[in-house]
């Protein structure tokens, strides 16, 4: 944990997780690859977990480029995200522009 603190990763992740909790309570998120791809037109932007597979990263990056959406890789793992959303996922669409801006400025 101390090595993570020295790299600044824990504070960014904590801020991200707190904001994700707010997004969830506001009903402004879509989770999981298939659901995100289906609703990508509604998304302000897409977040991915730091431990998402390279294959999934490439696939979601393709869809983001195709639909002109911003893709942000967080410092949070899927397990950390699961702790907030109660669902293990590595791909999250944020449907609110203000909330996505708040999340993406950490990176």
Residue ranges and their predicted role:
Residues 14-48:
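N-terminal first-folded block
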Residues 54-55, 98:
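Short alpha-helical
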Residues 1-14:
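Short, compositionally biased "basic patch" segments
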Residues 50-51, 75, 96:
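Short secondary-structure boundary segments
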Residues 79-107:
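C-terminal structural segments of small proteins and small subunits
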Residues 3-4, 27, 103:
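Long, amphipathic alpha-helical "stalk/connector" segments that mediate intersubunit docking
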Residues 22, 33-38, 55-81:
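Positively charged, polar, low-complexity stretches
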Residues 26-27, 44-45, 67-70, 90:
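Short active-site oxyanion
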